[in-house]
């Protein structure tokens, strides 16, 4: 169910972005749609839910009561931030590429996921070339899909390696 729901979510995020780029959607409608899609995905895949915040020098803060809402907030915040950066050439692609490279080199033992991350890194590097010349841009559909995917990778790593990534590191990586 995880792969199927991921494909549907990525499709719906791309569809929202495509509609927004084509005819335009209000910010309120987009945020509501982002929340509904993200909420359903996280509810179906609790692996991507942030259950606690691990502060580096302090105690772990349990947020089980609001964890799904906090997770949705983090994911949607990244999507909106990346979408806002898309208007300036190279900004979005360099930002996303840097996040992917950080995750790629931080978690060396995850071979399959490293290949998946490479699957995103290589096209982004090629995209940089054309984006620098102003020939192409990601658009809302591309930024939504990539931002959502990167947020899932970071949340998954944070849940599996709580000592390596504290809550402050997660938020710094996301924003």
Predicted regions and their residues:
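Divalent metal-coordination and catalytic microenvironments
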Residues: 21, 86, 140
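Function-critical hydrophobic alpha-helical transmembrane segments in multi-pass membrane proteins
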Residues: 66-82, 88-92
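Short, highly charged low-complexity linear segments
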Residues: 45-52, 73-77, 134-137, 158-162
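Alpha-helical transmembrane segments
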Residues: 4-15, 81, 90-175
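Unusually extended, aromatic-enriched hydrophobic runs near protein termini
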Residues: 53-70, 86, 122, 128-134
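N-terminal transmembrane signal-anchor/hairpin module of polytopic inner-membrane proteins
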Residues: 1-58, 62-63, 70, 163-175
């Amino acid at each position: 169910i995880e792969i199927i729901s991921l494909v549907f979510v990525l499709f719906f995020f791309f569809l929202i972005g495509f509609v927004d780029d084509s005819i335009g959607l209000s910010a309120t409608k987009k945020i509501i749609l982002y929340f509904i899609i993200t909420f359903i995905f996280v509810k179906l895949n609790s692996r991507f839910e942030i259950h606690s915040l691990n502060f580096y020098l302090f105690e772990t803060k349990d947020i089980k009561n609001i964890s799904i809402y906090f997770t949705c907030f983090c994911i949607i915040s990244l999507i909106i931030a990346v979408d806002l950066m898309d208007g300036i050439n190279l900004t979005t692609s360099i930002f996303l590429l840097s996040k992917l490279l950080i995750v790629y080199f931080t978690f060396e033992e995850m071979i399959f996921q490293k290949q998946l991350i490479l699957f995103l890194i290589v096209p982004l590097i090629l995209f940089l070339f054309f984006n620098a010349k102003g020939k192409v841009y990601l658009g809302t559909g591309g930024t939504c899909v990539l931002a959502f995917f990167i947020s899932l990778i970071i949340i998954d790593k944070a849940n599996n390696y709580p000592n390596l990534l504290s809550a402050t590191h997660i938020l710094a990586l996301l924003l």
